[in-house]
């Protein structure tokens, strides 16, 4: 029995040391040493940029006025002692009792007043802010920085029948590449002639009649492109009216 026990212990040790064999290749399987993964660092969420109230800190000072203690509350009526303003009994700001009426400071009406004593003026303490926070708060979010006065202005003038008029005097709008497009106006005589000629063309300009249309436009003083635009805009309207 004593010899059997050491044999069993040797067999159990061998089984522990035996490495597993892969069924497909027949090789011993080597396990890689397990390593503990390091936890990912957590990102700290920064607070949003401060608003104007935090940039300009307004400091106030409490001031106590008339006493509102009801001395006749026990008998069901109202009676005040007539004290119009809290007076410190010790001459210090931290005093809690009024020297005039003897009541506690909480019975007096409290009002916050700026430290400089003014009504409209306030004491502003400018806090330190970074340049990035300054841009977020004070700079334009659209990145333009241009005033609204530089927008396109609508003009109601007609200039020789040309549909597009550019600023030829080196204005700001020409530098920015802005082209003013004006609405072309025609006289009653031009409108009547264009209508008669459009009916003659059956409201369509064919390629073989391009030169004829050009001569007609020069004769009445209208740009050929304007005439075609006018004809396309009024073709359906005139046909419906008829």
From Swiss-Prot:
<dbReference type="InterPro" id="IPR009057">
    <property type="entry name" value="Homeodomain-like_sf"/>
</dbReference>
<feature type="DNA-binding region" description="Homeobox">
    <location>
        <begin position="179"/>
        <end position="238"/>
    </location>
</feature>
<keyword id="KW-0804">Transcription</keyword>
<keyword id="KW-0371">Homeobox</keyword>
<keyword id="KW-0805">Transcription regulation</keyword>
<protein>
    <recommendedName>
        <fullName>Zinc-finger homeodomain protein 13</fullName>
    </recommendedName>
</protein>
<dbReference type="GO" id="GO:0008270">
    <property type="term" value="F:zinc ion binding"/>
</dbReference>
<dbReference type="GO" id="GO:0005634">
    <property type="term" value="C:nucleus"/>
</dbReference>
<feature type="region of interest" description="Disordered">
    <location>
        <begin position="144"/>
        <end position="166"/>
    </location>
</feature>
<feature type="site" description="Required for DNA-binding">
    <location>
        <position position="231"/>
    </location>
</feature>
<keyword id="KW-0539">Nucleus</keyword>
<feature type="compositionally biased region" description="Basic and acidic residues">
    <location>
        <begin position="155"/>
        <end position="166"/>
    </location>
</feature>
<dbReference type="InterPro" id="IPR006456">
    <property type="entry name" value="ZF_HD_homeobox_Cys/His_dimer"/>
</dbReference>
<comment type="subunit">
    <text>Homo- and heterodimer with other ZFHD proteins. Interacts with MIF1, MIF2 and MIF3; these interactions prevent nuclear localization and DNA-binding to inhibit transcription regulation activity. Binds to ZHD11.</text>
</comment>
<dbReference type="Pfam" id="PF04770">
    <property type="entry name" value="ZF-HD_dimer"/>
</dbReference>
<feature type="zinc finger region" description="ZF-HD dimerization-type; degenerate">
    <location>
        <begin position="64"/>
        <end position="111"/>
    </location>
</feature>
<keyword id="KW-0479">Metal-binding</keyword>
<keyword id="KW-0863">Zinc-finger</keyword>
<keyword id="KW-0862">Zinc</keyword>
<dbReference type="GO" id="GO:0042803">
    <property type="term" value="F:protein homodimerization activity"/>
</dbReference>
<keyword id="KW-0238">DNA-binding</keyword>
<comment type="function">
    <text>Putative transcription factor.</text>
</comment>
<dbReference type="GO" id="GO:0003677">
    <property type="term" value="F:DNA binding"/>
</dbReference>
<dbReference type="InterPro" id="IPR006455">
    <property type="entry name" value="Homeodomain_ZF_HD"/>
</dbReference>
